[in-house]
Amino acid sequence: MLKDIRKPFQYPKLPIDKKEGAKKRAKAKDTKGTLRRIWSYLAERKGLLILVMLMVVISAIFGLLGPFVIGKAIDHFIVGKTVSGLIPVLLLLLAIYIIQSLSLWFQNYWMITISQGTVFRMRSELFTHLHELPIPFFDKQRHGELMSRVTNDIENVSSTLNTSVIQILSSVITFVGTIAVMLYMSPLLTLITLTIIPVMAASLKWITNRTGKLFKEQQKNLGDLNGYIEESVSGAKVIKAYSREKQITAEFLEKNAALKTSGFWAQTISGFIPKVMNSLNNLSFTMIAAIGGLFALKGWISIGSIVVFAEYSRQFTRPLNDLANQFNTMLSAIAGAERVFDVLDEKEEREDEKNAVHQPIQTGSIEFRDVSFGYDKGQQTLKHLQFTVPAGQSIAFVGPTGAGKTTVTNLLARFYEPNDGKILIDGTDIKTLTRASLRKNMGFVLQDSFLFQGTIRENIRYGRLDASDQEVEAAAKTANAHSFIERLPKGYDTVLTQNGSGISQGQKQLISIARAVLADPVLLILDEATSNIDTVTEVNIQEALARLMEGRTSVIIAHRLNTIQRADQIVVLKNGEMIEKGSHDELIRQKGFYSDLYESQFEK
């Protein structure tokens, strides 16, 4: 993921004007709305679409010419018992089928170009939009289910565009052209053939009314299953540690069975379409053969015309059959497209205030003024929180799980906005600053140190993309990471797998600290940065953090109190309220909650 990350990325041409994009693409809440929205993407390639339609018309016309010429040839050569002029007719047929084949090839080539370009745009727009969404959206979504929308659902749309659009256009043109030729040859036989259309339409409506919901349910169940698989793979160690293999398998089988059931009924009911169409097709052919034979005996129509008409009756029902078959894939693709558009319709992270300024943090002083916040309405996570951190000093937050410690950092980085109160940095309300300028001057070292797939050098350089190799190594030395990196077979060029599996949790943390060192932030956020670490590694991390915190305003969150004793201020939170505040020594002398917590940990 980090490969060539320093190279400038060329974004695809996406709608920059969000209001304009919203006007062009109405929200997809139904089938018609989704189709209109898909068309808005296709319409951007009108030139190629016109060429595709032209090729479809040519292939359909020449497809109709072939049987007509054959019918005339039967009357002339077989009924007339002569071979005079046979070669020109054969050459004519050869030319017809060559032109038809070439037009088919071009229409497929251009349609693939259109569909791949459209899907590229949709996928790019979806991925870009995902990273414009606020953190609360991701907190409420399963990552595997989101991945299913970016991959499976869009691929479903892609495969449908590749085949269905051409098939539908071709079927409509062939259907209209066939009826026109049939009317020219025999209006009476044409009327007899058309009697099956009401039966076809009624059958198709009955089936599609039932399969639409089933295909939507199938796509939903597929997303749920993908999310569960992603979760189980990510948590494989925990599953094995607690011997939950049987339980996880049982839950998987339950979700897999739900997908199987919805898929079974969607495919079974939609599978009736070709069966019904084929039966009606055979009925139509039988009627044409019987009635056409009687007409031929009476001399009302030639033998060649009967043969051609019978073939046209096949061609008449074939496009209807093809259209019916395309409903399966179309319904599935529409269901997938709706899931994609649901994400695209999610509101992006709240825009910066109109007068927000792009201003770097100068000193990093922090002030919370009567700040209250709740993730859910009616439930406050933080209540009237007030504190001040002078520039260059550190403040630590302690308290039981759910007290609101991490929420403080979420608000400080504007991942969430407070319900009440103000947060000031350098005396300026952070709402008046752009999020980009605010976060650019912050460094994060979190409990779960996320590393991207790529080399160690690339992961450290993520803190500052234009950093030289020497600066990367200097940052690693400051973070006490250089020695263990050098011991690896390929050193800084060691490739890490997803999320850094292959190195220890402590080593991941040291790389994360090196990344923060390289970023050179004014304000530092350490969220449980030394939890779940062995004692020796913790010493290295503590030394690295001490160097990193020097001269920087630092916000520390920790459960292990021995890691925050040197903090300038310690705030004790309980049920979202600040119940104690002071230095370590002051809080110990108070003999309150912090003192009891410290003594309990010290005794352990």
Curated annotation (Swiss-Prot):
Chain ranges of the ABC transporter domain: 366-600
The principal localisation class reads: membrane
Membrane topology (UniProt): Multi-pass membrane protein
Q: Which GO terms describe its biological process?
A: transmembrane transport
Q: Which GO terms describe its cellular component?
A: plasma membrane
Molecular function terms from GO = ABC-type transporter activity; ATP binding; ATP hydrolysis activity; ATPase-coupled transmembrane transporter activity
**Protein name, UniProt field:** Uncharacterized ABC transporter ATP-binding protein YfiC
Q: Which organism is it from?
A: Bacillus subtilis (strain 168)
